[in-house]
């Protein structure tokens, strides 16, 4: 056993890197199973469960850090109570579905503990992360170019998600990692690679058909415009500033024209027609804002919150679960709210404690030296990446409770944390 443990400890980064490279393949396999065979629990799900068990083994029996073991015991105790509540307080519980949903949620805190542990005093090559991102993007870009990808929506709206299943999940994953890769290309002045990447990135965003990734891309774009403008003003390079502003205006005009020919624009028109919006002022009602901006998520939250309020004290503390009165409960698709409602107050704290603690530390470190850090492209890109992940989790969901995405959230956060920690 000691030989096995020593081998794992020595090669854990390699093992984890292989697992990361498996993610696009697992997601494609899931998509095929769901689209073609309508099978919910797939071999991909099984592999992720096996890797979760491997993580538990590694943390408990290989590294043996008390703080990790205490946190894992807390997660396990909560999980047992959560399942007991589902059995005791529901007339017709679906245990299998509840376990599956629970595993999706505890994947984030456990993978965070794991990545913190293995990245401590070990080097992780970020190029591997960028390579995985490019694999994901290629499996969206190529199928969309040849019109052989799966539809982003089952009906009504347009868009293609390549060979993947969820437009929100794949859009969030790409949006979160992209700022760091862009910063790498900008810092190393790899202009040709940057242009090619941005063209592919832009095409993917516009053909996915979803709104949130566009918003995320705008945040990155605005940062670089501000960065350039402030630097040019500081250096009194007014001619370059005029050229930049002119280029920016032309780019915006060209983008507006280009967007009108994309599924993203078509979906906006479909949505506005559905809501019977005749003029811009018609949008500014609570009903239309909910439907157009939040995709009816506020209405879903209201319905689920009423169920939560009428539940017993144990369900308020440990969660409603995901199956009620013989059917699957409709998710709000705003991750923070879904975790709170379905996992309860205690579940919310346990699942998101390490996540929030890590983000708080990074933000605190960044804004403590905001003036200097703002002009540090790498650090600003890290903070932008976190802001994007928060927005995606809040606006579209399928980020924190989707293992295919949350594993990359864990990796990114730990990389960012270690980067800021090095300066202390």
Where are these regions (language model features)?
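N-terminal signal-anchor transmembrane segment
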Residues: 1-61, 80-89, 143
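Long extracytoplasmic/lumenal interhelical loops at the membrane interface
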Residues: 150-155, 161, 288-346
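Aromatic-anchored transmembrane helix interface
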Residues: 45-50, 71-83, 93-118, 132, ...
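A membrane-periplasm/extracellular boundary helix in multi-pass inner-membrane enzymes
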Residues: 228-286, 308-311
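Hydrophobic transmembrane alpha-helices and their immediate junctions
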Residues: 64, 73, 191, 230, ...
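Transmembrane alpha-helices of multi-pass inner-membrane enzymes
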Residues: 382-424
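Alpha-helical transmembrane segments of multi-pass inner-membrane proteins
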Residues: 127-153, 165-230
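Membrane-interfacial helix-loop-helix modules of multi-pass inner-membrane proteins that assemble, modify
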Residues: 29-37, 87-95, 138-170, 264-274
């Amino acid at each position: 056993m000691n030989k096995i443990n020593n081998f794992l400890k020595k090669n854990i980064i390699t093992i984890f890197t292989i697992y990361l490279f498996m993610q696009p393949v697992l997601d494609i396999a899931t998509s095929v199973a769901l689209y073609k065979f309508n099978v919910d629990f797939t071999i991909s799900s099984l592999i992720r469960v096996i890797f979760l068990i491997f993580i538990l083994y590694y943390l408990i029996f290989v590294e043996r850090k008390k703080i990790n073991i205490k946190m894992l015991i807390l997660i396990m105790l909560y999980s047992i109570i959560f399942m007991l509540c589902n059995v005791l307080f529901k007339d017709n519980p679906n245990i299998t579905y509840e376990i599956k949903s629970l595993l999706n949620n505890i994947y984030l805190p456990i993978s965070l503990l794991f990545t913190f542990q293995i990245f401590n005093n070990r080097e992780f090559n970020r190029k591997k992360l960028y390579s995985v991102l490019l694999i994901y993007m290629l499996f969206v870009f190529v199928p969309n170019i040849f019109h052989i990808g799966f539809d982003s929506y089952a009906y009504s709206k347009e868009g293609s998600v390549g060979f993947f299943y969820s437009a929100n999940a794949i859009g969030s994953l790409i949006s979160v990692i992209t700022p760091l890769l862009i910063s790498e290309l900008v810092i190393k002045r790899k202009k040709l690679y940057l242009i090619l990447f941005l063209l592919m990135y832009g095409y993917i965003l516009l053909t996915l058909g979803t709104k949130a990734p566009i918003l995320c891309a705008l945040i990155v774009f605005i940062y670089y415009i501000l960065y350039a403008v402030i630097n040019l003003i500081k250096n009194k390079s007014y001619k370059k500033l005029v050229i930049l502003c002119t280029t920016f205006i032309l780019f915006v005009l060209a983008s507006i024209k280009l967007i009108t020919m994309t599924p993203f624009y078509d979906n906006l028109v479909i949505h506005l027609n559905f809501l019977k919006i005749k003029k811009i002022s018609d949008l500014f009602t609570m009903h239309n804002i909910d439907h157009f901006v939040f995709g009816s998520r506020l209405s879903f939250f209201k319905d689920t919150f009423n169920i939560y309020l009428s539940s017993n004290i144990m369900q308020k503390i440990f969660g409603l679960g995901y199956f009620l009165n013989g059917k699957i409960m409709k998710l709000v698709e705003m991750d923070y709210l879904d975790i709170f409602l379905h996992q309860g107050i205690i579940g919310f704290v346990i699942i998101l404690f390490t996540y929030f603690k890590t983000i708080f530390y990074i933000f605190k470190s960044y804004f403590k030296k905001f003036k200097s850090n703002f002009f540090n492209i790498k650090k600003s890109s890290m903070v932008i990446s976190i802001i994007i992940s928060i927005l995606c989790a809040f606006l579209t969901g399928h980020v924190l409770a989707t293992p295919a995405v949350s594993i990359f959230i864990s990796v990114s956060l730990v990389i960012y944390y270690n980067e800021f920690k090095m300066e202390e």
